[in-house]
Structure formats: structure tokens, C-alpha cells
Amino acid sequence: MSEQYSNDFKLNAAMAAIVLSGGVIGYAKSKSMPSLIAGSVFGLLYSTSAYYLSQGNSKVGLGVSVLASSLLGGVMGKKAIATSKPIPIILATGSAFTLLSSGKELYNIHKN
């Protein structure tokens, strides 16, 4: 793995774990299938991003990260504004940070 993208790898692996565990916890607490499905889908996207980054395919890894972060940020941002609950706020903030980090690196790749 390129040392240049190791922070993006760690960030995407952490987001995968957070989102997947959040979906499982949401299902366990309230039998929420949407939480389980969304947590699984976004966890898989972030895991895919981390995998490609670990294999040195930074364009694909960062692209998947930007996609996942954009979608999750939009959904959770809307929910955070509507409910002011902490979990949507945390997920919206985490996805925004991941989007900025991965987006900046992807921009730098395409700029050069």
C-alpha cells in the first residue's frame, strides 16, 4: 500500500466499521431493516474503497470513497437537519470529512 494513501485507507476502514456496526445496532435495538440494509451497503462501499486503496489502486479506491461519502452525507445530512439526533449528525460529519479527504486526494491524482 502506498504510504501516501494510508490515512485514506484507515479512514475508509474506520467508516466501514462504524457504518456497519451502526446498522447492526439499529436493527438490534428497534428491528429497523432500513438501518441494517443501509449499514451493510455503505459498510460494503467503504470496505471496497479500503480494499482498493490497500492494493494500490488509488483511483478506484478514492472514487468509491467519494461516492459512498456523497451518498451517506446527503442521506444523513437531511436526517440530521430534520431530527437533530446525534447519530445522523455524527455520520453526516464523518462522511463529510471522508469526502473532503478522499476528494482532495482524487483531485490531486487527476490534476497531475
Swiss-Prot record:
InterPro entries: TMEM14 (IPR005349), TMEM14_sf (IPR044890). The keyword Membrane applies. It is a multi-pass membrane protein. The chain crosses the membrane at residues 9-26, 36-53, 60-77, 87-109. GO terms for biological process: regulation of heme biosynthetic process. Keywords: Membrane, Transmembrane, Transmembrane helix. GO terms for cellular component: mitochondrial membrane. It is found in: Membrane. PANTHER family: TRANSMEMBRANE PROTEIN 14 HOMOLOG, TRANSMEMBRANE PROTEIN 14, 15. Belongs to the TMEM14 family. This is Transmembrane protein 14 homolog. It comes from Dictyostelium discoideum (Social amoeba).
